[in-house]
């Protein structure tokens, strides 16, 4: 307990004297929390403070006192239950208490084991620990609600393409919404056999599917970029935090960023500022963030070297996506270099998923094979390769709902099998 708590327990105004009184009736290990002096642990004799094991702390900002005691106890017990020395138990306790009081909130501010070990090993130069970006990144990325070993995302968040097809077929946005519900049903029907299936769907043309998806335990990605706009434009980009605060917490914010290192300087700065603002908004609202880099656009081909340079640039800006979504490159060396670079900057990232870019399944065989040795690559987020044929035929009234679902289901299953074969 704190000095005040020991004074109450022992009935004395002097803390040491109070602890002596308590020692007469208990042989337990006593821990006294002494604020800025750290803590002192007494295993036996309590004749003076030097008889105990004192573990100091450095001065930090006390931002929030709620939960400090429980945090301290959690840290001490972490060491105690594993048979650590009392000094080590106290180091854990002090660190957990310090991190708790330096952040807003109570239990959510407590560190993960990885964060705790990092803080004890390297400390922080910040007086306000919550302003230590490295520490905050570790806190965020090691306390995620769900960790994914694989992710097979059926992406049907496309809007411009669906509107073009619907226009040619004299169909409405309501028809598109119905089709996207069929796509969701495909994902749900396969989830029993492939539990790592997820979806990417928008709330403009696919709102019904997006709402129904919440009934199932699956990964849900949701786009925030305005479809078909170049340069990059974000929905409600003037008030992103307020906008995202309305999203369910399990919706991963996805942004498709058409960017290249050889864009003109003004455009590069504009895009970087938008993505940085979006990233900060996601952290403010506790939403995970998926960054999709597209270098092949406006008649320019995919450029693997630029993808790596863009990833490097985003880390320089302090942007740490929870997921990277990368163009389908066939080069093994590219994937090796990309994963090594991501790991060196953010070892706790969820991982990388490969996008399809409307390529055929034969192409994806080569891409998946090129990624096979990289554990950081968790799967794919592919759309048109799966739904294009079914969507066009369905919008033209050439096939039924069940037929459309069968086409999409078979293609999605085949992609998953191709992925699994590349890993065997």
Model-derived regions, located:
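A generic structural signal for short hydrophobic patches within well-formed alpha-helices
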Residues: 5-7, 39, 116, 387
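Conserved phosphate-binding/catalytic region of the ribokinase-like
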Residues: 12-133
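Anion (oxyanion) recognition and catalysis
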Residues: 94, 214, 276-279, 283
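Alpha/beta catalytic barrel-like cores
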Residues: 126-267, 320, 350, 361-371, ...
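Domain-level signal for soluble alpha/beta catalytic cores
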Residues: 146, 160, 259-262, 297-305, ...
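Conserved, mostly hydrophobic/aromatic
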Residues: 154, 292, 324, 383
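Alpha/beta enzyme core
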Residues: 181-188, 238-252, 267, 274-275, ...
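Short beta-strand/loop segments at the ligand-binding rim of alpha/beta enzyme cores
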Residues: 217-220, 285-289, 345-360
